Regions:
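Compositionally biased, low-structure terminal segments
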Residues: 5, 12, 22-23, 118, ...
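Long, contiguous amphipathic alpha-helices that act as assembly "spine/axial" helices in icosahedral shell
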Residues: 1-15, 71, 157-159
Length: 186
């Protein structure tokens, strides 16, 4: 839940370079890169995001050799995403994008039904970081000798834990707000 919250907030929240995590002006050396779009999910916008991640170079001008492997969508985009990633053919032509990433449909993204994210998760470093500071511990007050049970006939249950999520490497993520139609290549 924390990671998906960070993902959705990435269009506004800043990462280590002082820019929003998803931004059109990330600097690496003399080059400027974008990992942000406003295009609706389509074959064309998916290819654009894939190309964006795969084209990023490090500060010495060499490819980071990143290949995105996970498409994250809200339930409203599941059908479109499945067509892009799983269909043998689309509109009578071979789907060359089949199998280029795994699909994760995330209910927590339902509040933003047009957002979609393409991530590179196959490396040790990740685009988002989940930090478990204190493992969740479940407790209960259910014994007959507990005051709440004896006096009020109430059984209490609780959980205590600490964790957080934040931004890792923007180079490994591409996000879109899905506001405008992508132009078909022709």
């Amino acid at each position: 839940e924390l990671v998906f919250g960070a993902m959705m907030s990435g269009f506004n929240e800043k990462c280590y370079d002082g820019l929003s995590f998803f931004n059109t002006a990330h600097k690496v050396g003399d080059a400027t890169y974008s990992n942000r779009s406003n295009k609706k999910l389509s074959r064309e916008s998916y290819m654009e995001g894939r190309s964006s991640i795969m084209s990023i170079k490090g500060d010495k001008g060499k490819s980071l050799k990143l290949v995105p492997d996970l498409l994250v969508v809200p339930p409203a985009l599941e059908e479109t995403a499945r067509l892009i990633l799983e269909a043998d053919q689309i509109d009578g032509t071979t789907n060359v994008l089949k199998g280029t990433a795994k699909l994760h449909v995330e209910p927590a993204l339902a509040e933003h039904p047009e957002y979609w994210f393409l991530l590179c998760t196959n490396r040790f470093l990740k685009p988002f970081i989940y930090q478990l500071r204190k493992k969740i511990k479940f407790t209960s007050l259910t014994r007959d000798t507990d005051e709440n049970v004896f006096m009020l006939d109430e059984y209490l249950y609780g959980a205590d834990g600490r964790s957080n999520a934040g931004y890792g490497f923007w180079q490994m993520a591409y996000g879109s707000t899905g506001e405008v139609e992508a132009q078909a290549q022709g």
